[in-house]
UniProtKB/Swiss-Prot annotation:
Changing R364S: Loss of activity. The gene is pgdA. Its cofactor is Zn(2+); Co(2+). Keywords: Carbohydrate metabolism, Cell membrane, Cobalt, Hydrolase, Membrane, Metal-binding, Transmembrane, Transmembrane helix, Virulence, Zinc. Changing D275N: Loss of activity. Disruption phenotype: Cells lacking this gene produce fully N-acetylated glycan, become hypersensitive to exogenous lysozyme in the stationary phase of growth, and show reduced virulence in the intraperitoneal mouse model. PROSITE patterns: NODB. Enzymatic activity is inhibited by EDTA in vitro. This is Peptidoglycan-N-acetylglucosamine deacetylase. CDD domains: CE4_SpPgdA_BsYjeA_like. GO terms for biological process: carbohydrate metabolic process; cell wall modification.
Length: 463
């Protein structure tokens, strides 16, 4: 009896264990099935999101573009190449294909290439901004990880590449002027010398047609290589290139500036300049004569003469004239040490800035004596002359007028001295003569305008 009961007990326990195992297996199968079903759902949902993103891009970008769909390693690439008529714009294709070849990583990504059209700032030219957009496809998530501009492609209205050399009537002269202007721009940024020299060399070694550029806000924008801190771009005013630019590309605002530039260039102009003041006895008389004829001039003053004549210096500026630097005590700067010469100039800059609140950044070296080392050590423009009245020598009214009559030409800078009474007395006759010859009177900044650069020497409007 006991053995029979024991056998039945053992058999029951075995059955319970078996049933439990079957239950666990059934639950596991259900869970696994649910997990697989969820993964299938998750994968389908993920694929639907990918297809939805592709459709969204297709709706946005298919018009006017040729779509190409391919794989680069593990990356799925969809490129929208813009069409000109029925042909792909080749310069855009080349830029995209180069990026695919050189920079696209072989990862499980979805990559879009496309362009956006924008105004170029030039007549008959459009920009295509080429963009790369990358989405990571990881763990059933679509995440945008990069949106990069590959650069701008400039195109003519018929879809042909527009390069910087095409903007100019004389590409060789334009490149020479561009190098000069960008060198001055870089110097003002205080870039390390070896870096600045490398940037200039890279531009010089490249054909103008290969320069990376943009045009906006009446400026030619250049992109240097190598890129250095505080110098992502070089912005040069288009007015500095009016002599060599193809004006047909200029829009209304810039075309008006261009026309104004040539109107003024063909207008007869002369700049009267006065050195060695201020002199409280004679300078006010010069100012009164200039005011009578409504003429603005440029005064190069000595630093030592400013003390005690601060109000007179302020009057010169307040009446619309320009005040420049003529050294502290009128030495021959080229015969001084570099430090001594710089001190003569910087001390005068300091006193003028203190009295006037700012500096004109114009300097005239006494006797016209200056060295390259002095010029290159100071962020000033150096103003010489091409007409010497010799008033300092003759001190004779008739002789002063005669000298000017013999030398003056369109764009001349006339040297006189506001410290001599004969000059004061000759000034009305000089003005009357020049007016009768059709001259308009301008200050140095008005005459030289965008030509004015630090460290440079100027003898006239065109020299």
């Amino acid at each position: 009896m006991n053995k029979s009961r024991l056998g039945r007990g053992r058999h029951g326990k075995t059955r319970h264990v078996l049933l439990a195992l079957i239950g666990i297996l059934a639950i596991s199968i259900c869970l696994l099935g649910g997990f697989i079903a969820f993964k299938i759902y998750q994968q389908k949902s993920f694929e639907q999101k990918i297809e939805s993103l592709k459709k969204e891009k297709d709706d946005q970008l298919s018009e006017g573009n040729q779509k190409e769909h391919f794989r680069q390693g593990q990356a799925e690439v969809i490129a929208y190449y813009p069409l000109q008529g029925e042909k792909v714009i080749s310069s855009v294709r080349e830029l995209i294909n180069q990026d695919v070849k050189d920079k696209l990583e072989s990862k499980d990504n979805l990559v879009f290439y496309y362009t956006e059209q924008e105004e170029s700032g030039l007549k008959g030219v459009v920009n295509r901004n080429v963009t790369k957009q990358i989405y990571d496809l990881v763990a059933f998530k679509i995440e945008e990880t990069e949106k990069t501009s590959l650069g701008k492609v400039h195109l003519t209205e018929d879809g042909q590449p527009f390069t910087l050399d095409q903007l100019f009537s004389d590409a060789s002269k334009a490149k020479e002027q561009l190098i000069k202007e960008l060198t001055s721009f870089i110097e003002d940024k205080k870039i390390e010398q070896d870096q600045s020299e490398q940037i200039v060399k890279n531009f010089s070694d490249q054909d103008l047609s290969a320069w990376n550029f943009d045009y906006k806000d009446s400026q030619i924008i250049l992109y240097p290589s190598p890129v250095v801190e505080n110098l992502e771009e070089i912005a040069l005013p288009v007015s500095a290139f009016f002599d060599v630019i193809q004006s047909s590309y200029l829009l209304e605002k810039d075309a008006a500036l261009y026309q104004s530039y040539f109107d003024k260039k063909h207008q007869k102009v002369v700049a009267l300049t006065f050195d060695d003041g201020p002199n409280p006895a004679t300078t006010p008389q010069v100012l009164e004569t200039l005011a009578k004829y409504d003429i603005k001039a440029t005064f190069f003053v000595l630093g030592k003469n400013v003390s005690g004549n601060e109000d007179l210096v302020k009057r010169i500026k307040s009446e619309g004239h320009v005040v420049g630097n003529h050294s502290w005590s009128h030495p021959i700067l080229s015969q001084l040490s570099l430090d001594e010469a710089k001190k003569q100039i910087t001390d005068t800059e300091d006193v003028l800035t203190k009295v006037l609140g700012s500096s004109s950044k114009l300097m005239r070296p006494p006797y016209g004596a200056i060295t390259d080392d002095i010029r290159n050590s100071l962020d000033l423009s150096f103003i010489m002359w091409d007409v010497d009245s010799l008033d300092w020598k003759s001190k004779n009214e008739a002789s002063i007028l005669t000298e000017i009559q013999h030398q003056v030409a369109n764009g001349s800078i006339v040297l006189m001295h506001d410290i001599h009474s004969p000059t004061v007395n000759a000034l009305p006759r000089v003005i009357e003569y020049l007016k009768n010859q059709g001259y308009t009177f301008v200050t140095i900044p008005e005459m030289l305008n965008t030509r004015l650069k630090a460290h440079e020497l100027y003898y006239s409007r065109d020299e």
